[in-house]
């Protein structure tokens, strides 16, 4: 009898469903996957090594470029690590602003994930719906930091500035008439908090629209139910965190188990799945968007009632205001020293983690007392998820690789670092 050999093929890195620069070497028996071998490193930028040659403040923008869909959550973990080493107390208002933007970031991430996942499986409409809502949240990013993605808004000791009193409006353009301009600016007449509150009021109906399109869709369920199943014990062994772990039935969320920022004072639920398949991971993330919206409403309510400082008043850690620099020589010296030499951080080692949209994003920082980290290790949540690709895909059809890969919510900025 002739010997039958398995067929080996490349999936990516140019494949549109490869989520960036993933190269999967698949071993196939017909259309059934016998082995899936992820090859990483095509987006490696030596972030951890670069951090050793930059001051603590200069390192902050690198965090945005790791998981470039969950920008401010990465910054939050970095700031928590530096603040632990410094022993600095963050003002309560800054903690609520961080919590607010962490949840805005979570919704941004899950909207992109849902749109891309649906597109990968073959449902195009959802992608267009999701980007409609992302636009409003990107405008919030831009209003507070000047950038739609890489915000660099958090600082060790607080946040760069308070929330603006006026939400920026669309300007007249030859490409839109006066009536359209009026429609676009209808909910931008007040402050940023007014705009976010208006969005939070509308958002649950948008999530209902996504669920109408997908949750009971027969084709969607055929592509996701029973695909890539991981049980609770195995998920823990593989190092899963975030929605990947919770969809397997493990109620582990750092916002509850190890609260940081203002999460201990807020009311929200932790969505948990049952079977640990692709469909459960979809349901958990959709439920998380609803819970994030609940948290946003509570943060907006608190921030309205409680004005106050948004960054520490220690000028050796945080820069003085521009007004002070123009009137005080000492403030100008502090500013110059902080941005030229940086701050000397006490020697020690810490680990700080946040519940990022993809899972536990952690920073392990070692300081030798200088103005630069001695070593910074980044714990990317997507890395152990991708490592389980072989186990999750084995025995499935080649078309299911796309569904399994998309359900992990892979971003290679953080995996390759």
Curated annotation (Swiss-Prot):
Its EC number is 7.1.1.-. SUPFAM superfamilies: HydB/Nqo4-like. It is found in: Cell inner membrane. GO terms for molecular function: NAD binding; NADH:ubiquinone reductase (non-electrogenic) activity; quinone binding. It comes from the Bacteria. Disulfide bonds: none annotated. PROSITE patterns: COMPLEX1_49K (PS00535). Keywords: Cell inner membrane, Cell membrane, Membrane, NAD, Quinone, Translocase, Transport, Ubiquinone. NDH-1 shuttles electrons from NADH, via FMN and iron-sulfur (Fe-S) centers, to quinones in the respiratory chain. The immediate electron acceptor for the enzyme in this species is believed to be ubiquinone. Couples the redox reaction to proton translocation (for every two electrons transferred, four hydrogen ions are translocated across the cytoplasmic membrane), and thus conserves the redox energy in a proton gradient. NDH-1 is composed of 14 different subunits. Subunits NuoB, C, D, E, F, and G constitute the peripheral sector of the complex. This is NADH-quinone oxidoreductase subunit D. It comes from Acidithiobacillus ferrooxidans (strain ATCC 53993 / BNL-5-31) (Leptospirillum ferrooxidans (ATCC 53993)). The lineage of its organism: Bacteria, Pseudomonadati, Pseudomonadota, Acidithiobacillia, Acidithiobacillales.
């Amino acid at each position: 009898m002739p010997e039958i050999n398995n067929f080996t093929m490349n999936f990516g890195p140019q494949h549109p469903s490869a989520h960036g620069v993933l190269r999967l070497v698949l071993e196939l028996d017909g259309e059934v996957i016998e082995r899936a071998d992820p090859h990483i490193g095509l987006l490696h930028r030596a972030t951890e090594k670069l951090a050793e040659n930059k001051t603590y403040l200069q390192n902050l923008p690198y965090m945005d470029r790791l998981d470039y869909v969950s920008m401010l959550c990465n910054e939050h973990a970095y700031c928590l690590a530096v603040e632990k080493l410094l022993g600095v107390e963050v003002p309560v208002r800054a903690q609520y602003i961080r919590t607010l933007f962490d949840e805005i970031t979570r919704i941004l991430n899950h909207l992109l994930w849902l749109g891309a996942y649906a597109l990968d499986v073959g449902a195009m409409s959802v992608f267009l719906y999701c980007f409609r809502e992302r636009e409003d949240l990107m405008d919030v990013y831009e209003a507070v930091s000047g950038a739609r993605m890489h915000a660099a808004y958090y600082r060790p000791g607080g946040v760069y500035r308070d929330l603006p009193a006026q939400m920026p409006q669309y300007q007249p353009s030859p490409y839109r008439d006066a009536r359209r301009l009026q429609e676009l600016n209808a909910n931008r007449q007040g402050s940023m908090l007014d705009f976010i509150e208006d969005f939070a009021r509308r958002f649950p109906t948008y999530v209902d629209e996504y669920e109408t399109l997908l949750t009971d869709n027969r084709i969607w369920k055929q592509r996701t139910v029973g695909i890539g199943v991981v049980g609770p014990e195995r998920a823990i062994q593989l190092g899963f965190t975030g929605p990947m772990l919770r969809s397997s039935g493990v109620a582990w969320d750092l916002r509850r188990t190890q609260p940081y920022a203002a999460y201990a004072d807020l009311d929200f639920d932790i969505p948990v799945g049952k079977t640990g398949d692709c469909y459960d991971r979809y349901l958990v993330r959709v439920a998380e968007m609803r819970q994030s919206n609940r948290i946003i409403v509570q943060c907006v309510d608190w921030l309205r009632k409680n004005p106050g400082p948004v960054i520490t008043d220690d000028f050796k850690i945080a820069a003085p205001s521009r007004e002070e620099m123009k009137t005080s020589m000492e403030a100008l010296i502090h500013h110059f020293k902080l941005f030229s030499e940086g701050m000397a951080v006490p020697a020690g080692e810490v680990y700080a983690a946040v519940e990022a949209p993809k899972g536990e994003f952690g920073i392990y920082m070692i300081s030798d007392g200088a103005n630069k980290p001695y070593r910074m290790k980044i714990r990317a949540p997507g890395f152990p998820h991708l490592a389980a690709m072989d186990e999750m895909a084995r025995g499935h059809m080649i078309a299911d690789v796309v569904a399994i890969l998309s359900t992990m919510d892979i971003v290679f900025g953080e995996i390759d670092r």
